[in-house]
Amino acid sequence: MNELLSKVNRLIRRTAQRLAACEASLQKLNAEKEKLAEKERLYDMQLKNLKSLLDKKELLGEVVFRQDIFYSLRKVAVIQQQIAEINLEKQKIAERRKILNKEIVQQQAQRKHWWLKGEKYVRLKTRIKKTFKSDASSRRA
């Protein structure tokens, strides 16, 4: 009977280790997700600033020299290029977030699996102990 209890205890420890590993993995994934969200907020701020700068570069009925027009066009092209690069980075972040969400769902399923196994082994251990106690008391009687 003690041998059976020791095997069940070993199973309980193993499931607790796997559960802890799942928790650690989930924390790591959530931390990475937070970093991505922070990056995206920074990119949004940069986009907002670049778009406002782009709006300021519009020539609204002003009399300007030809060189000023070319200068403004170069500035606008640079700003538009920066906006395109930021949008590309935001797309990469969105793709990574999708992957992270899938990994998080998988880890949550694994965590649930190991938690249920652990609970099953704990219930088994209590049943074994009850059986052991009832067998011991019936032998005494």
PLM feature segments, named:
Residues M1-A141:
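Charge-rich amphipathic alpha-helical interaction elements
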